[in-house]
Amino acid sequence: MSKRDFLSTADLTRAEVDDLLDLASRVKGKKPGQVLHGKTLGLLFFQPSLRTRVSFEVAMVQLGGHCINLSNDDLYELEPQEQAVMDGAAEEHVKDAARTLSRYVDALGIRAAARSGDWARDRQELLLRSYARYASVPVINLETSFGHPCQALADLMTMREQLVSLRGRKLTLMWCNHPEPKSLGPTHSLLQVAALAGMDVTLAHPLGFEIDDEVLRKGRATAQDAGGALRVVNDREAAARGAEIVYARSWGAPKYWSDAEREAVVKRSLQDWRVDEALMATTQNALLMHPLPVRRNVAATDAVLDGVQSVIYEQAANRAHVQKALLMQLLK
């Protein structure tokens, strides 16, 4: 029997997303019992994690399974390229690590969101895709520089809970300032599922902070096919006006991917790109969302993060429920 991986929201149909979120809602309302008794999930984190790590551990335990966590310090430096001459720093090939771990665990989760400085390389998700290629068990994307599908599904679940029907609802996905260049993963994945749901999506960012060209192009086509829309604006106030959801997120620009110092200089003039009470006052009493962690009073102010329209903790809680549903689909 062929295995199923969970690598990208771009691989999902509308029906598959709906089925998974429907299952997540049922799981949230009623504990499913020990349906994964005897199953083991291996999690490999090459970057720090709080919500992803804990929510997957909790999900697996509540389903009766077991979870093993390995961080970057626990792992050898890996070589993802096929037929590489391994006379450099890499101690082990991904092929050997993936095939070995497949003998121990029933599924693997990989977080590999490192920034190499080469966007053309990082957008290929080489480490994640290499694990998926060589592992004989399901591989789950826990975030790369290019995608974060688990976060996006929890985001969509939260929107469904708050607004019920999503088709035509106005989502503003807004770039916010941050002292570091962050992954585009949450932005790309949310845009993909929001377009699939037929939402009216406004992507707002300063000039120079465009997302990946292919993701934007496919997102527009998906939105049109689903009865929604996707537009890009470079004015934060115009983007927020009339929004029903404001999703704040920082991301590093592919344009500056090889020059973080230059990006930092550019962002000094963009400190007004944050979500505050004045901006939220122009919306349709919009929900405020953020995937966390958040730089308070840089990306968004305390007043809006702690305000009555904020659903950031509901988002975080729904990570566990979405991931329980995902694990049940992959392993049950």
Please describe what each predicted stretch is.
Residues 221-303:
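Rossmann-like adenosine-cofactor binding region
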Residues 285-287, 291-332:
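Adenosine-phosphate binding glycine-rich loop
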